[in-house]
Amino acid sequence: MSPQTETKASVGFKAGVKDYKLNYYTPEYKPQDTDILAAFRVTPQPGVPSEEAGAAVAAESSTGTWTTVWTDGLTSLDRYKGRCYHIDPVAGEDNQYICYVAYPLDLFEEGSVTNMFTSIVGNVFGFKALRALRLEDLRIPIAYIKTFQGPPHGIQVERDKLNKYGRPLLGCTIKPKLGLSAKNYGRAVYECLRGGLDFTKDDENVNSQPFMRWRDRLLFCAEALYKAQAETGEIKGHYLNATAGTCEEMIKRAVFARELGAPIVMHDYLTGGFTANTTLAHYCRDNGLLLHIHRAMHALIDRQKNHGMHFRVLAKALRLSGGDHIHAGTVVGKLEGERDITLGFVDLLRDDHTEIDDARGIYFTQSWVSTPGVLPVASGGIHVWHMPALTEIFGDDSVLQFGGGTLGHPWGNAPGRVANRVALEACVQARNEGRDLASEGNVIIREASKWSPELAAACEVWKEIKFEFPAVDVFHKGKKKN
């Protein structure tokens, strides 16, 4: 080999493998206002120290790899690397730790949830040195938030569009979720909307199947929408699911909904993907459409308490990517959701500012500046007896969505909707009069049922229905405040 082509190790470079903690565990580091902060629940493999595990997470989700590389010398790793700056043991758990990691903002593309997640929850989740890894929370800095459009419209603009104030909005998912023809589907929509609903909804499974193509469904739903509006004098909506196999097809469906004069469309944001969701959110703002978001696939990601990603992170990501509604559990229905934890991410969706809150599982103070809020949707196994609890838990700025709790009424769809509307109005009136919905809820519903045979029939059908199972997602104290 000639002297000109001989490869020599540069000064300061030594090949080999180094412990991650030598470069990526920095307990002396003070997080910057512009850093993205992450709280990971880390379960190391036996024999792996917590400092090495936390540093490995910081390294593998930022600039690090398994061995030293000579190109490290071509950049400033101190500027770009993630840093594990604090570790707390998880109370009540063996060999589990909350590891806090700070990421410099320059690691992430502006306005891209896709890029943010590709780094923070990418390959590191398959790292062999870890038995399990869960992202519990993120602190998104204001500087990064301002690169996103966020929700197309937000809570106040939606209320102004609908001219509905002072109460939760009411919705219903059309059932059976699959198998109806477009005409029969439209008939069910009409019966629900004329009975007192604000919205009806495509099920998340409904896209464009052989039994009901999307264009036919939209046409019959639009007919039902306008007929119900003419009869009731109220503005109505149907969540037309625009989710499709390609972004181009998704936008085509949203365009058709706008041409029909529909006020709202829908997207399955996790199965559809964040790039598609952000694209649709931008279209909706530009064209005056509200955007309803379903979270199908979330439990695959967030239900296991030791591995995956907590829904509060997915909720923050949705507020960045864009959506005016998102399903958020019910606390009292058939789906997983402990009360305080649920209210924690409901606050993250609606409020301009949230503080650290142990009881609600919020690890970081989060400011949303001018980003519009998102309406939480309570849906899944709820009926009229749940109405007082739902009104008390979620408050006015929410959507209470009954599927089987409407269409399962013994007298049909329209009476089912009447029952729910009467129950809601009774709860709102009682609350405004100063009554305690938590303790007097059943009394309030029984009193209202004396004046509504539809509500009385619903009360009889669902009087024994309960979903009482312990929540998997509970908060373990023993964390550092940031």
Curated annotation (Swiss-Prot):
Q: Cite the SUPFAM superfamilies for this sequence.
A: RuBisCo, C-terminal domain (SSF51649), RuBisCO, large subunit, small (N-terminal) domain (SSF54966)
The EC code for this enzyme is 4.1.1.39
Which UniProt keyword terms apply here? Acetylation, Calvin cycle, Carbon dioxide fixation, Chloroplast, Disulfide bond, Lyase, Magnesium, Metal-binding, Methylation, Monooxygenase, Oxidoreductase, Photorespiration, Photosynthesis, Plastid
Complex and partners = Heterohexadecamer of 8 large chains and 8 small chains; disulfide-linked. The disulfide link is formed within the large subunit homodimers.
State the HAMAP family in the record: RuBisCO_L_type1
Q: How is it modified after translation?
A: The disulfide bond which can form in the large chain dimeric partners within the hexadecamer appears to be associated with oxidative stress and protein turnover.
- Residues annotated as binding Mg(2+) are K201, D203, E204
Q: Where in the cell is it found?
A: Plastid, Chloroplast
User: Other comments?
Assistant: The basic functional RuBisCO is composed of a large chain homodimer in a 'head-to-tail' conformation. In form I RuBisCO this homodimer is arranged in a barrel-like tetramer with the small subunits forming a tetrameric 'cap' on each end of the 'barrel'.
User: What is catalysed by this protein?
Assistant: 2 (2R)-3-phosphoglycerate + 2 H(+) = D-ribulose 1,5-bisphosphate + CO2 + H2O; D-ribulose 1,5-bisphosphate + O2 = 2-phosphoglycolate + (2R)-3-phosphoglycerate + 2 H(+)
Which class of enzymes does this protein belong to? lyase
- Extract the NCBIfam families matched here: PRK04208.1
Pfam families named in the record: RuBisCO_large (PF00016), RuBisCO_large_N (PF02788)
Q: Which Gene3D superfamilies match?
A: Ribulose bisphosphate carboxylase, large subunit, C-terminal domain, RuBisCO large subunit, N-terminal domain
Q: Which family does it belong to?
A: Belongs to the RuBisCO large chain family. Type I subfamily.
- Identify the catalytic residues: K175 (proton acceptor), H294 (proton acceptor)
Q: What does the UniProt cofactor note say? A: Binds 1 Mg(2+) ion per subunit.
GO CC annotations, alphabetized: chloroplast
Q: Name one GO molecular function term.
A: magnesium ion binding
Reported cofactor(s): Mg(2+)
Q: Tell me the residues on which N6,N6,N6-trimethyllysine occurs.
A: K14
Role, per record: RuBisCO catalyzes two reactions: the carboxylation of D-ribulose 1,5-bisphosphate, the primary event in carbon dioxide fixation, as well as the oxidative fragmentation of the pentose substrate in the photorespiration process. Both reactions occur simultaneously and in competition at the same active site.
Q: What is this protein called?
A: Ribulose bisphosphate carboxylase large chain
- Sites binding substrate sit at N123, T173, K177, R295, H327, S379
Q: Which species does this protein come from? A: Phytolacca americana (American pokeweed)
